[in-house]
Design a protein with these regions (language model features):
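Extreme N-terminal leader/anchor segments
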Residues: 1-56
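Short alpha-helical hairpin
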Residues: 54-74, 87
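Aromatic-lined, polymer-binding surfaces characteristic
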Residues: 79-304, 311-312
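CBM-like, beta-strand-rich accessory domains located in the C-terminal region of large
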Residues: 151, 309-311, 340, 344-348, ...
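Carbohydrate-active enzyme catalytic cores, enriched for enzymes
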Residues: 253-433, 484-489, 494, 598-599, ...
């Protein structure tokens, strides 16, 4: 790539003048953290640790770890490849920027300047031309010049550091030429390597790499070649939107965490395009809007994302809706989140995403709006046809009942889990029956355990997994599965799924919310041979589940649920795990319902689950009609009859 001969005496003041005209980064960061002393102290502690060469990375078990002064950029010190790539993303620089904004202490920008100079010196870019079989390995895997890390650096830590150092006059004459040369190295690599790695533009890595390329062009837009960088990036980002965002809005991998990560990147592209005067096509902007809708529907009423697949129950929704407001000026997503998440919690969550939320004041949003139920004109269900996912809830409030239900077989890639027709259920402000999260990407026993069907809210036959776990990101023997239907009627919402993982046996599952207060899980297994037991698994977010004398399972927490299963199922409890962040797990209780019957043909199983706080509802025995297509039960003075005929569901409620 031909590079412009630079007149440093001219270029530096041009660039600095432009960046100083932007909103001052330190002022904005101080505004976000003004009344958040705990968050400020947490960030200051992290930044001071970084000045001592200690950072928290994958494999350090959530504790500061000495990575060197300067860091050993190439070295995997904990036998975890993510350690190297995260170190080379320099996310601790962001904490140092905030720490300076709060304290004015020069030690923080001095660390950024010294580490940037050391990285440029210690990590020369490998050649991007030549035999592809020799070039490719240098930009894949846990290496400083992994193409993914190159893209992430440009749009995140390096862009933030660039703006900060320029605005606060810490970009030194010695560092600036090194910085420009390294950005040019990044741009050349991002133009040439990723298109060969991802020719279909269908992976989140390619999205990261092209947003990074666009940001390289923004940082050095005074250089003639920057327009070429941004033109290629824009062209490829439009392909990314087409190939990575489905028509219904979900990101193709179907993991809410990665979805929000991708929306963060699309949003940052849109913001950079605004600053650079580049217009994004209207159809691409509409796809991004649809994607923000998905993020909202995949939000638990507890204020956390559903940890489906390789996801955590995180708070990225704050970043997503904040970026949505910054890009589109639309408040509907912010209004919905403000109804679900209390203001003080929302402000605390936003401190984790300061750089994405410049100019977003949740304080003013909450004070300016009256969040009455009848004013929020958002549907209560969302069917992602291409992802084979359905999300529905009883309302946009923290006590609503909500279901995330999916049946995507085969999985799109290794970020999926072995959970066909699985679901995640919340009620009364608590996640009750949950997806276990992700824990790690390392090749170890816990990775397989977390991905197992038996750790999800699923059904197994003969104790066998629906398909085979090969390694951390690979499965085998996947068959087919899909969502069949989403239906809504008076007092109910129901969705149906089917998969052939145990062929010739066919598993159908219907999940419904009835009467705004009950979760119904109806499993139907056809072509049973009578040779193997059927197990239904529920991963319960509790340690107090116990079997009552009438056969009901009940919990004894602040927020509880009771479960009554149809007759003929043996109930026992197994230890479970829930992971809410990388490298951390806590115990849960798995409820196992087992049918050891030997009859052949069709079998039906029904679970009635009711959330409650203090007084456990009395659920009667659950009975099927002889044909297995009609089931009935009562709760208190209400009698319920459910019919599931030929893939159609009908529900009747009567009061005694």
């Amino acid at each position: 790539m031909k590079r412009t001969v630079v007149d440093w005496n001219s270029l530096f003041p041009q660039v600095q003048s432009r960046v100083k005209r932007q909103e001052n980064l330190c002022d904005s960061l101080r505004a976000i953290l003004a009344d958040q002393p705990e968050a400020a102290e947490r960030i200051l502690t992290t930044a001071r640790n970084a000045c001592e060469g200690k950072v928290i990375l994958s494999g350090t078990m959530g504790k500061p770890f000495f990575v060197g002064k300067p860091p050993h950029w190439h070295e995997d010190m904990v036998n975890d490849g993510e350690f190297v790539v995260e170190l080379n993303r320099m996310q601790h620089w962001n904490d140092c920027i905030i720490a300076y904004a709060l304290t004015g202490e020069r030690v923080f920008p001095e660390l950024i300047v010294s580490e940037m100079a050391d990285w440029i010196k210690s990590c020369p870019r490998p050649a991007v031309e030549g035999d592809w079989d020799e070039v490719r390995p240098n930009f894949r895997g846990p290496k400083p010049w992994s193409s993914l890390e190159g893209g992430l650096r440009m749009m995140n830590a390096w862009y933030n550091a660039f703006c900060f150092l320029m605005q606060e006059d810490f970009m030194t004459p010695a560092l600036f030429p090194l910085f420009v040369g390294s950005v040019e190295d990044h741009a050349e690599m991002l133009m040439k390597v990723p298109p060969k790695l991802w020719p279909e533009a269908n992976h989140n890595h390619y999205l990261s790499e092209n947003v990074g390329l666009f940001y390289a062009g923004e940082m050095l837009q005074e250089l003639p070649e920057a327009k070429e960088w941004q033109a290629q990036a824009e062209r490829e980002l439009e392909r990314c939107a087409k190939n990575q965002l489905t028509l219904d809005g979900g990101q193709v991998e179907g993991c809410p965490l990665y979805h929000n990560v991708c929306i963060d990147m699309f949003g940052k592209w849109a913001l950079s395009a605004k600053r650079c005067g580049v217009e994004i096509p209207s159809d691409v902007l509409q796809q991004i809007r649809n994607a923000i809708d998905y993020a909202l529907y995949s939000l638990r009423p507890t204020g956390e994302g559903v940890p489906w697949g390789d996801s955590d129950p995180d708070d990225q929704i704050v970043q997503t809706v904040g970026l949505g407001y910054r890009v589109f000026g639309s408040r509907e997503w912010v209004d919905a989140v403000c109804r679900i998440i209390p203001l003080e919690k929302l402000k605390k969550m936003s401190t984790r995403y300061c750089f994405s939320l410049i100019g977003v004041s949740f304080d003013s949003f909450a004070k300016a709006a009256d969040f009455r139920t009848d004013e929020l004109q958002l549907p209560l269900s969302n069917w992602q046809h291409q992802l084979q996912q359905v999300m529905f809830r009883t309302g946009w409030d923290k006590d609503a009942l909500s279901v995330f239900f999916a049946c995507r077989v085969p999985c799109q890639n290794g970020h999926g889990h072995i959970d066909p027709a699985g679901f995640d259920f919340c009620g009364l402000g608590k996640a009750l029956l949950v997806d276990p999260g992700r824990y790690t990407y390392r090749e170890e026993e816990m990775r397989q355990t977390i991905k197992s069907a038996k750790m999800h809210n699923t059904l197994t036959i003969g104790g066998r997994e629906p398909f085979t776990y090969i390694s951390s990101f690979h499965f085998a023997n996947e068959k087919d599965g899909c969502i069949l239907d989403l239906s809504e009627g008076e007092n109910y919402t129901a969705a149906q799924a089917l998969h052939t993982s145990y062929f010739p046996m066919i598993h159908q599952r219907l999940v419904a919310i009835l009467d705004r207060s009950i979760l119904l899980v109806w499993d139907r297994v056809d072509h049973m041979t009578g040779e193997e037991p059927v197990e239904i698994w529920y991963n319960a977010n509790t340690l107090t589940a116990a079997l009552q004398s009438d056969g009901t399972v009940a919990t004894h927490d602040d927020v509880n649920f009771c479960l009554r299963a149809s007759e003929g199922l043996r109930i026992d409890f197994q230890p479970g795990v829930i992971s809410e962040q990388v490298d951390a797990v806590r115990p849960s209780t798995r409820i196992r319902l087992t049918d050891n019957a030997s009859e052949k043909g069709v079998r039906n199983y029904l679970s009635v689950i009711v959330p409650y706080q203090e007084n456990c509802p009395k659920i009667s025995a659950v009975r099927f009609e002889e044909d297995g297509k009609t089931a009935s039960f009562s709760i208190g003075q209400k009698k319920y009859q459910c019919n599931w005929w030929d893939d159609r569901f009908h529900f009747d409620l009567s009061c005694c």
